[in-house]
């Protein structure tokens, strides 16, 4: 009897210590991944600010295109303002509310933290990478737009004309260029959309991501050139951070095997064949 009791005790103790070791190992891995992701984020943000020193011909062409596009929108600011203000009454309240809530910085960071936190807790490197991409891009583009807002000191539509500037102004009414809502929401949209190949999935994500920037035009908080530059800035920064992370091979995860299904027909037979 004592032998059975002793054996049972050892079995229970073994299971208990095994669970403790597993829990401890899991916590250690979470902290290890968290530290690793923080380092990747810091390096990615740093690279975003030094990247212009390594631009090639295509990069300068892209920058020139953004300047030209922003200039075109600048010339159309007043006409665009009139158009969007006329549409404001026709927009459903639920759409306007979504634009405001989705575009607010606190909700953006909740969404970003949710993506990264899910990847961290589930030990999913692909989702963790998306979270790091979003956070790194948001930090870099957020700093850029904050500095630009203060330096340029452009008046919001409700304060003055589109050509009214007060350089280095501390007044919120002169922090219009570029749109911070556009930068944050399109950073998230572009980073997530890059994970999908389907045109329709991408289109849906970009459509949702465009609601918040456009809503800033409905409420007369920004000029169309503010929004256009904000969206362009977010795309460029996300692409730059994504390319940097790929070149450095920060997250090497095995892609799941896919099965290619094909319809095969033969004499008196028909069926689906899966190729691994």
Language-model segments: what does each one mean?
Residues 13-15:
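N-terminal signal peptide c-region/cleavage motif recognized by signal peptidases
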Residues 63-67:
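Alpha-helical transmembrane segments
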Residues 69-79:
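Alpha-helical transmembrane segments of multi-pass membrane proteins
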Residues 77-87:
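Membrane-interface helix-loop junction between the first two transmembrane segments
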Residues 85-97:
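Perimembrane loop-to-helix junctions flanking transmembrane segments
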Residues 109-115:
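Hydrophobic cores of alpha-helical transmembrane segments in multi-pass inner/ER membrane proteins
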Residues 118:
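Active-site microenvironments of hydrolase-like enzyme catalytic domains
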